[in-house]
Design a protein with these regions (language model features):
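A structural boundary/capping signal
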Residues: 1-289
């Protein structure tokens, strides 16, 4: 599974104007830059260190334009900021584009890499020996699972069901990349297409909670488009459509319940406030540099 090809294909479904050839050329350039800075005989961990420094430390290898966390849009709320082409152009990334680029380059360099997820977060997993290491791409370093458990408020149930922090199989990692496509389809109200993509992701990883939630959202959008926008009350729906309406209403709730049973919970205002405060502190720190 070629992570670069998959990410470019997904991004072009979101924005057909993405220049696949230009993205490929920039990935080639970055790959060559890492290779040129990597002495022979390094351990996998040391090779990953070179990859990270090539991205995040200013030098001739990145035209003195290091890649950085976008503190103005850290969550990638502006969907175009999650596109690989945007990240490569602006050098400002988020918790989707940054780990995906590390995984793409790591794969090209022959390192054992994949993606893993946390609540509203994606990280790169790297096999540096017998154990997997978390590469926190937004900070350009490494992080323990226990730190994510604390910082992201991951529940004991979520750890038990392994919906978070598990090193994903390559096809499952591509499903994580498809989360941005699902966001775009939901925003456009393309309920049937959203359902189709969610089903494809779930066929590969039945416990992908983002896809589970998006499947619930797809049922909600179908209800809005087919019934709630046309009929003032459920009793006004024609008898021949009542069974379909009931099925979709039930399925919407059932898929949300499935996510909760796996240990997912909606982000709390407290956690988001704490995270945004850390971003403000980082902005102040950068302003003092």
């Amino acid at each position: 599974m070629d992570f670069a090809a998959a990410k470019i294909a997904i991004d072009r479904l979101i924005d057909p104007n993405v220049d696949a050839a230009a993205v490929g050329r920039e990935l080639d350039r970055l790959t060559r830059a890492v290779v040129s800075r990597t002495p022979a005989g390094l351990t996998p961990r040391a090779r990953m260190d070179v990859l990270l420094s090539t991205l995040y430390t200013a030098g001739d290898w990145n035209d003195h334009r290091p890649f950085r966390y976008d503190l103005d849009d850290p969550m990638g709320r502006r969907r175009e900021n999650k596109l690989l082409s945007t990240y490569l152009r602006t050098r400002k990334g988020n918790c989707v584009s940054m780990p995906v680029l590390v995984a793409i380059l790591g794969q090209r360099l022959g390192l054992v890499v994949t993606l893993a997820t946390g609540p509203e977060h994606v990280m790169t997993k790297f096999a540096g020996g017998e154990n997997w290491l978390n590469v926190e791409a937004t900070a350009g370093g490494y992080k323990w699972d226990s730190s994510y458990e604390r910082d992201l408020d991951i529940s004991a149930r979520a750890l038990e069901t392994e919906i978070y922090l598990r090193p994903l199989a390559p096809r499952e990692a591509v499903g994580v990349m498809a989360s941005t496509l699902m966001e775009a389809l939901a925003a456009q109200g393309r309920a049937d297409d959203l359902m189709a993509v969610a089903d494809m992701v779930l066929a590969v990883n039945p416990t992908d909670v983002v896809a589970i939630i998006q499947k619930a959202n797809a049922y909600y959008l179908q209800l809005q488009q087919r019934y709630n926008s046309r009929y003032a009350r459920p009793t006004d729906i024609p008898p021949g459509l009542q069974a379909d309406y009931a099925m979709r209403s039930r399925a919407n709730l059932e898929w949300f319940a499935k996510a909760e049973a796996l240990g997912w919970h909606p982000p709390t205002a407290q956690n988001r406030t704490r995270y945004l405060q850390s971003i403000d502190q980082e902005k102040d720190t950068r302003g003092q540099l």
